[in-house]
Amino acid sequence: MRFTVAIDGPAAAGKGTISRAVAAHFRFAHLDTGLLYRAVGAKVTEGADPVAAAEGLDLADLARGDLRSAEAGQAASRVAALPEVRAALVAFQRSFARREGGAVLDGRDIGTVICPEAEVKLFVTASDEERARRRWLELAAKGGAQSEAEILADLRERDRRDREREAAPLRPAPDALLLDTTELTIDAAVNKAIEAIELRQAQGRE
């Protein structure tokens, strides 16, 4: 059985948490596509050519411990603006999406570019301030020293870059369900996503 769930949205909106929970609930495979770009960005920061880094990416590269840092996020946004890098990673993502047993992919262009035929498309968002608060709490728990104001500025700069890039800009697919998590608990947001998927599965059985 092939069933693809595409979950897009800006940084720290909750799409990763929702994606992991949804994948576990339905026993689908999960791919955080942002890690692909973070891994490429990390290699570029170390001196690698962006396209060569993307073409030579291995699953083992996604296990690096520094991929969740703010620096890796900014590097990811820069390399994601390169059409050649995005093209090099498309086949990897599409192959994962159509695997047997179902798949959940989260990123910024899954529903619009990678899997426009996905059975379910969600676009997860939240206010800038709430996203900055969440990211600050996440980083502070790991000993991060960035202030909430600095994180807010970084998020807004990354949003601007992601929305204005020519290659696969950040935007919801026309048929995506918009899920604003600003006022939602994690459980409430996950439940809304599960309900949307279960509804689509029921429609497919009719």
Curated annotation (Swiss-Prot):
GO CC terms of this entry: cytoplasm
Keyword field: ATP-binding, Cytoplasm, Kinase, Nucleotide-binding, Transferase
Signal peptide: none
Main subcellular location of this protein, as a coarse class: cytoplasm
Protein's GO biological process: pyrimidine nucleotide metabolic process
Compartment(s) where it occurs, according to its Swiss-Prot or TrEMBL record: Cytoplasm
Family statement: Belongs to the cytidylate kinase family. Type 1 subfamily.
Protein name: Cytidylate kinase
UniProt organism field: Cereibacter sphaeroides (strain ATCC 17023 / DSM 158 / JCM 6121 / CCUG 31486 / LMG 2827 / NBRC 12203 / NCIMB 8253 / ATH 2.4.1.) (Rhodobacter sphaeroides)
Gene responsible for this protein: cmk
